[in-house]
């Protein structure tokens, strides 16, 4: 499992399932990564600590030649660029918009919830996270993603 950005790696199509975790709180990020270890997750987690770094990472991968993450776990309260703006830019990009985004936040604000869903977030989980909620959400989205990208078999 990768706990940071390996900016020199060029990823191939057969690379593992990659999750981009955008979380500025070290303790929260470690808990999330430990939860994935408990789930037996065999993919990679790329952990970035602010919204600007996330947008830079996505722009680099958006241009082609590098595999896009298959899921983004996104905090809303981030330094440099907030999570709402990151979500908005992901969903406005033709190449990025299909990436499922799960908001992980301490915010219970109706305004944050409305803004996230108006920007087409796939799921909205409130911290502290239940291991079961995180597991269910990630498994459902992973199944959707893999099913959506699967080519139809021979007729």
Swiss-Prot record:
Keyword Glycoprotein found: no
Domain of life of the source: Archaea
Residue numbers of 4-aspartylphosphate PTMs: 75
Gene3D superfamilies, alphabetized: 3.40.50.2300
Modification comment: Phosphorylated by FilI.
Induction: Transcriptionally regulated by FilR1.
Keywords: Phosphoprotein, Transcription, Transcription regulation, Two-component regulatory system
One Pfam family here: Response_reg
GO biological process: phosphorelay signal transduction system
Response regulatory domain boundaries: 18-142
PROSITE patterns documented for this protein: RESPONSE_REGULATORY
Function: Member of the two-component regulatory system FilI/FilRs, which is involved in the regulation of methanogenesis.
Record protein name field: Probable methanogenesis regulatory protein FilR2
């Amino acid at each position: 499992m990768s706990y940071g950005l390996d900016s020199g790696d060029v990823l191939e199509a057969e690379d593992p399932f990659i999750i981009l975790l955008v979380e500025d709180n070290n303790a929260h990020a470690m808990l999330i990564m430990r939860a994935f270890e408990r789930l037996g997750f065999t993919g990679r987690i790329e952990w970035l600590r602010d919204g600007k770094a996330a947008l830079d990472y996505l722009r680099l991968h958006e241009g082609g030649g590098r595999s896009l993450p298959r899921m983004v776990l996104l905090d809303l309260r981030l330094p440099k660029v907030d999570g709402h703006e990151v979500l908005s830019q992901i969903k406005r990009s033709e190449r990025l918009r299909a990436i499922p985004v799960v908001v992980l936040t301490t915010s219970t604000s109706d305004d944050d919830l409305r803004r996230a869903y108006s920007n087409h977030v796939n799921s909205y989980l409130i911290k502290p996270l239940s291991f079961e909620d995180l597991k269910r959400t990630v498994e459902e989205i992973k199944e959707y993603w893999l099913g959506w990208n699967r080519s139809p078999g021979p007729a």
